[in-house]
Amino acid sequence: MALTPLSDALERILSDVEATLDCDTVALEAASGRYCAATINATLSVPPADNSAMDGYAVASRDVPGALTISQRVPAGHAPVPLEAGTAARIFTGAEIPAGADAIILQEDAGAGEGQVTLPAAQPGQHIRRRGSDIQPGDELVAAGHRLTPQDIGLLASVGLDPVPVFRPLSVAVLTTGDELREPGSGDLDPGQIFNSNRLSLAAQVRALGMKVIDCGNLPDDPDQIGDALERAAAAADCIVTAGGVSVGEEDHVKSQIEQRGALDLWKLAIKPGKPLAFGHVAGTPIFGLPGNPVSAFITFALVATPWLIKRQGGQPSPMQRFPVRAAFSITRPGTREEFLRVRLTGSGETLRASLTGSQSSGVMTSLSEAGGLAVIAPGTTVAEGDWVEVMPLSAL
């Protein structure tokens, strides 16, 4: 079977995905991390009126320099009265500008006396935040499909919006397979066993996307049990993610059970780690069959499953961020697969360097936990120390 480039696999997978557009409304305070279900435009100006950017004195610029009587005091949240000619208003940051004033003079530039203040010259408009200078009616604040951030919550609050229209979170069933797997916290390992890291790692990746996890646990290497579990997952979830059982071993039963109970494309991706990938459906529910090695499972989920899930959720998959970094390692990769090396990032600016996190084996989880990014190495490439390499930050995956 020919190797499939990652870009080709993504194009095929993403071309047919349809968004699940079930909508809900939630309180603004609970909306962070949710995917917005409608484009939101402003209906008012921010700020709603001219206000002071500083503590000081509101004046008509034509009246200064000179000594002026203080005619009123304007704290934030209180409506001013029109400024009397030839006077100054004591004003505080955020307070509305009195009609008749066109400048703010900083309090540290003023010489205060009993009921009067001596003020320097001022330019019209200085230290004034104009009405609508941040947001004007009709401005687009959030696009449909955008995943709401804490910054967005503040933005929407500033225009008084509450509640917010959002998409229902996808439900993603996560299951692993393998007689050798034991759950963390369940006791000591017996001979031949290892702890199951994939189930919890994949569930965490799903939750990080703002989606719900249906935990289907770990299945033994028994085809009937695996098949029955897949059908139960298909009935309960919007998508299924499995780890293990999609290679060509005698005990790799996930592949055969998907084929029996649905449809399957089995690809050999031209990436390392993460060559085997299954994508298809069970009883109409899409399924990703990821490799069993922990690093491979993590990376294929991040590179392949994540953009599909975001699009299915109604979101907007972003191009994978890459930035150039000087290599603090040397390596030759004569093969035919694009490689994603786990790298530690040190320094900043022109001194930023990427160094390998040790062994790059697909079973070495420390290579991921110690990494700040993935260095993308094209097939047939030799990298010398000091060469530029492209790095994908793990925080963006």
Q: Which functions belong to the PLM regions below?
A:
Residues G94-A95, D179-E180, G245-V248, G292:
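Short glycine-rich anion-binding loops that position phosphate/pyrophosphate groups of nucleotides
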Residues G249-R261:
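Short Gly/Thr/Asp-enriched flexible loops that form oxyanion-binding sites at enzyme active sites
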Residues D24-E29, I135, E259-L397:
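Flexible glycine/proline-rich
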Residues D50-S52, S61-D63, P80-E84, I97-A99, ...:
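Solvent-exposed alpha-helices and their adjacent loops that cap or buttress functional pockets
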Residues H127-T242:
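Phosphate-binding glycine-rich loops and their immediate beta-loop-alpha structural context
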Residues M1-D162, P324:
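Phosphate-interaction motifs
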